[in-house]
Amino acid sequence: MTSNENFENGFDLPPPDDSAEDLKLFIKKFERSLNSALLEFDENNQETIENFRQAKEHKMRFETECDQKLRNWKRLAIEREVSEEQSGEVQFPRWIDEWANTKLGGIFERIFSKMDSMQNDMNSRFDAMQTEMSVMKNGIASIKGEMAEMKGEMTVMKNDIASIKGEMAEMKGEMAVMKNDIASIKGEMAEMKGEMTVMKNDIASIKGEMAEMKGEMTIMKSDIDSVKGETTTLKGEVTAMKDSISQLDRKIDLLDQRTEERFNNMAQTMQKIDDRSCKSMMLTRKYENMVRSDMHYSAVPVPFLNGDEPRDYELPPLASFEDIDNLTKEQCIQYLHGYGVNKFSPLETVKLKERLQEAIGLWSKGHESHKYHTF
């Protein structure tokens, strides 16, 4: 007899002829090819969780299609054998329906055994996937713990910096007091110079009276010489004090320069730490959204690279694909700039929304069919 059944199988197996025996042989070859393909699926799809899910879904669809084909072909094999018995092509009498399994070489038993094996395999793989999801959740919890420790260390570092700033403020206060003392010394030196001027006037007055005091000239000269000696000593001391003050001024200038350099270096270091912390927080939120989206939970806000939150710029929150689809083009571009995505064409529409979806980690196999609208 002739049949029009579709024997396209995906394994390049030639279709059977119209005999029941050849159809049973075709079924056995298909089962072996199917087992080999399933084993290859298991071996080649363990690299990442995403690939494993995709392979799992593809495998389940493939198993369902193949199971349906097997059922149709086995039903066809029974019909053909019954037809051959009725036409006299088979050399033994037709048996009742319950003996069909025996006439086909125990094929029903093998079908049910294979179905049980496939069900057990699917259950074990589902359990393995749940175990992997549990491991992933534990990993995320560990990352959150490390981030909390890092925040604690950052708090300690900020406190140390505040302490250093306080000590520097105290040092500046002491420097101000020292400058006031130096100014006071300079004022006293000015007063001393005034007194020296008065002394010079007194000496001039003494010289005017020398004509009247010739008898006391010798004594006056001795007094004047003594005064000159003391004046010379005082000038030397004043010169030494000026040198000390000049050296102190140079040291103060050098200390101010070094202090400013240290503050600049410290500011640069703090900026680098803030940049890295902001980027780390952005990536952590992105990976968290990937897991939440895969589990059909709403996305959490992802901070920008500079540490600011989107709400600081009065941008609407993004918790789902619909929120992205409702953005204006200006809001979408502002979001992309905040996440460091700057290379795109101004003519893009749907592609901009897809870039923003990837930037915040809003992605799941279950949402691949979502289509965005143009602006």
From Swiss-Prot:
Its principal location? cytoplasm
Q: Where in the cell is it found?
A: Cytoplasm
Q: Which UniProt keywords apply?
A: Cytoplasm
Q: Which Gene3D superfamilies match?
A: 1.20.5.170, 1.20.5.190
Question: Which superkingdom?
Answer: Eukaryota
What is a single cellular component term in the Gene Ontology annotation?
cytosol
Pfam (any one)? Mug135_C
Per the record, the similarity remark reads: Belongs to the UPF0612 family.
Protein name stated in the entry: UPF0612 protein C569.003
Classification from the root reads:
Eukaryota, Fungi, Dikarya, Ascomycota, Taphrinomycotina
